[in-house]
UniProtKB/Swiss-Prot annotation:
Residues 1-20 form the signal peptide. Belongs to the cystatin family. This is Probable cystatin-16. GO terms for molecular function: cysteine-type endopeptidase inhibitor activity. CDD domains: CY. It is found in: Secreted. The keyword Disulfide bond applies. GO terms for cellular component: extracellular region. Disulfide bonds join 84-94. The keyword Ligase does not apply.
């Protein structure tokens, strides 16, 4: 009986370990459609949450990862302050600020994406 209980406990621990490994973030293509939309959401969220008047735009995607078997994306982004205001249109084509106030930031976001519902949730940001 003790041997069976030990074996069962060992299998349960092994199963949890395998499940945890499968739920880790893995590298993905930066061009993956749902990832790109999630990046746009993260940049828009950054601009709306930021107290500055100027808008920031995407400069570079440093890291693109997805949690296995989910639509949860981890992204590390470089953003640059533009000369445009937050609510201006076409911020992507707005020039970067080139003055002593020039500012570039590196941010990490975790976004839960449900694009078929047009629903995105920011789970974490730094």
């Amino acid at each position: 009986m003790f041997l069976k209980a030990t074996l069962l406990l060992g299998l349960a621990v092994l199963g949890m370990h395998v499940w945890a490994i499968q739920m880790e973030f893995v590298d993905i293509s930066k061009d993956l459609d749902y990832f790109v939309v999630s990046v746009e959401f993260a940049v828009a969220w950054f601009n709306s949450d930021n107290t500055e008047e100027q808008a920031y735009k995407l400069l570079e995607v440093r890291r693109a990862q997805q949690k296995s078997w989910t639509m949860i994306y981890l992204m590390e982004l470089d953003l640059g302050r533009t000369i445009c205001k937050k609510h201006d249109e076409d911020i992507d084509n707005c020039p970067l600020q080139e003055s002593p106030g020039e500012r570039k930031v590196n941010c990490t976001f975790i976004v839960d994406s449900r694009p078929w519902f047009t629903q995105f949730t920011l789970l974490n940001s730094t």
